[in-house]
A protein has these predicted regions:
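A broadly tuned preference for mixed-charge, low-complexity surface segments
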Residues: 46, 86-88, 108, 113, ...
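C-terminal engagement/docking regions of AAA+ P-loop ATPases
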Residues: 121-227
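Canonical AAA+ ATPase core
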Residues: 4-99, 148-153
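Generic alpha-helical structural context detector
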Residues: 7, 54, 68-71, 110-114, ...
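A general structural signal marking secondary-structure boundaries and capping sites
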Residues: 12, 73, 77, 116-120, ...
């Protein structure tokens, strides 16, 4: 089962015997984890966890959000409506792929990842004993990919350092393998990521060439029409 899921997540295909089946687009894998109780479950191997783009931590809802939940449960359940079609989603993905990424942004993402592997080189000598293994190259890739999507959501055609920085916790937290000393000292992956982000200086990007030289990317509607 694990190898089949690995194949699906990485290669977008499933092999049964001698037959290989391509998975439809768009395709994604979502998993949930109970942070309080894990009895009767088995942890995913690091190789599989690494294939998840983000790990999003969802805490308790705010007071007003919880009141809204209760109100909705007390009323008639509304019918679900389609927010976006598969074709439109593929069009949006194509638009995100066209968002410009400066070489300095790529280097910034790689440097953030490196800070989790060799913290002593970034003035974080105290973190060495808490990290058994730092983040893999997939972390760098996903910070850039996620940065493109976030820049698009923020109404830009180019990625800025804050797009990568804001996604760093979601991309890095599940890719760190902490030592027993970290568990004993109650050091969390999030605290390590926070220190790593603080230790790496974000690049300064001038909004001139080559940013202004980039062709205007199509809007979502135009992309979906051409998809």
């Amino acid at each position: 089962v694990q190898s089949a899921l690995l194949e699906a997540m990485q290669e977008r295909q499933v092999t049964i015997g001698k037959q290989t089946f391509r998975l439809p687009d768009p395709f994604l894998v979502m998993a949930t984890q109970n942070p309080i109780e894990s009895e009767g479950t088995y942890p995913l191997p690091e190789a599989q966890v690494d294939r998840f783009m983000f790990k999003v931590v969802i805490g308790y809802p705010s007071y007003h959000e919880e009141v809204t939940v209760v109100e909705r449960m007390s009323a008639e359940i509304p019918e679900a409506a389609t927010a976006v079609t598969a074709k439109e989603l593929l069009g949006l993905q194509a638009v995100a792929d066209a968002v410009y990424v400066d070489p300095k942004i790529r280097e910034y993402a790689v440097t953030l990842t490196a800070a989790t592997r060799r913290p002593q080189e970034f003035g974080l000598e105290g973190l060495r004993r808490y990290i058994s293994y730092g983040a893999s190259p997939r972390a760098s890739l996903n910070m850039v990919l996620g940065g493109r999507a976030l820049a698009l959501l923020r109404g830009r055609e180019y990625v800025m350092p804050e797009d990568v920085r804001d996604l760093a916790p979601e991309v890095l937290r599940h890719r760190l393998v902490l030592s027993y000393e970290a568990l004993a000292d109650d050091v969390t992956a999030d605290s390590i990521v926070e220190q790593a982000v603080g230790a790496v200086q974000a690049p300064r990007i001038a909004l001139g060439d080559p940013y202004e030289a980039q062709k205007t990317i199509p809007l979502a509607g135009e992309a979906s029409q051409g998809a």
